[in-house]
C-alpha cells in the first residue's frame, strides 16, 4: 500500500449507516488480522460485526441486515464481491475510494469499530493495523484526515473529567457543533470539572476507608481481637 498521505480533494459520498460503517471497518480489520480468511464470507463478516470485544457499540445484526449493508457499500464502490468462489466473499475498497494511505486507513478503521478515542487510545487500538512510532505521528495523520476535502475525522470537545480530546470519524455523518473542540482552546488546560471530579473521588475513597475500618473493628470485636493496631493509622 502507498503510505504517502494524499490530501487531494475526493468526491463526497453519502453518510453511511451505522451498520455500513461497521461492515467497512470489519473488512479492513480482518484483511490485516486474518489474511488467510480474507476476503470474508457473509457468515464471517456477520460474526465480525457482532464481535463482543473491540467494538463500540456491540451489535446483534443478522446476516440479512449485513447483506443489505454490503449492497449499500457496493453501490458506493467501497466494497466488492469476489467471483472466484462458490461462496460469496467480500473485500473493501476503502483506501482507493477515499484516497487513504495505510496509516490513515488504520486510524479511520479503528474509529469505525470502537467509536471516539484519544490519539493515545488510537495508537494502542490500531497497533495490529499499523504500528505508529509515537502519539505525535498519530496526531499528524488525524490532522490530515481532518483537513481532507471533505474531512474524514473531527476533534471533539472534552467532556467533564477528560484531560485529552477525543476524535471521531465523519463517515456516518456530521456531529453537532456543541461536541466540537473550540479553536484556540488550550490543549493543556484541565477544566474545572476535572478538579471537581478528583475531589469527589477523594471523598468517595475516604468514605470507603472509613466504612472498611468500621467493618474491621466489628469483626475484631466478634473474634475477641484487639483492633487497635489495625486502625491505629486511621487518623494519620
From Swiss-Prot:
Superkingdom in the source lineage: Bacteria
InterPro entries named among the record's database cross-references: DUF480, WH-like_DNA-bd_sf, WH_DNA-bd_sf
Protein family (similarity comment): Belongs to the UPF0502 family.
Designated name of the protein: UPF0502 protein Bxeno_B1639
Amino acid at each position: 500500500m502507498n503510505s504517502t498521505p494524499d490530501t487531494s480533494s475526493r468526491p463526497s459520498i453519502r453518510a453511511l449507516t451505522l451498520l455500513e460503517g461497521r461492515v467497512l471497518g470489519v473488512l479492513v480489520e480482518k484483511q490485516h488480522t486474518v489474511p488467510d480468511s480474507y476476503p470474508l464470507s457473509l457468515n464471517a463478516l456477520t460474526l465480525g460485526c457482532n464481535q463482543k470485544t473491540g467494538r463500540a457499540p456491540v451489535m446483534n445484526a443478522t446476516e440479512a441486515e449485513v447483506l443489505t449493508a454490503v449492497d449499500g457499500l457496493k453501490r458506493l464502490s467501497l466494497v466488492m464481491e469476489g467471483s472466484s468462489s462458490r461462496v460469496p466473499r467480500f473485500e473493501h475498497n476503502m483506501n482507493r475510494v477515499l484516497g487513504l494511505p495505510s496509516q490513515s486507513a488504520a486510524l479511520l478503521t479503528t474509529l469505525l469499530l470502537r467509536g471516539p478515542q484519544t490519539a493515545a487510545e488510537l495508537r494502542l487500538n490500531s497497533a495490529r493495523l499499523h504500528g505508529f512510532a509515537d502519539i505525535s505521528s498519530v496526531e499528524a495523520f488525524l490532522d490530515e484526515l481532518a483537513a481532507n476535502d471533505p474531512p474524514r475525522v473531527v476533534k471533539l470537545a472534552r467532556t467533564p473529567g477528560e484531560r485529552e480530546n477525543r476524535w471521531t470519524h465523519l463517515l456516518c455523518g456530521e456531529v453537532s457543533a456543541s461536541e466540537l473542540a473550540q479553536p484556540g482552546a488550550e490543549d493543556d488546560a484541565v477544566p474545572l470539572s476535572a478538579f471537581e471530579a478528583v475531589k469527589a473521588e477523594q471523598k468517595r475513597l475516604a468514605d470507603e476507608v472509613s466504612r472498611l475500618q468500621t467493618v474491621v473493628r466489628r469483626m475484631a470485636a466478634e473474634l475477641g481481637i484487639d483492633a487497635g493496631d489495625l486502625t491505629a493509622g486511621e487518623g494519620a
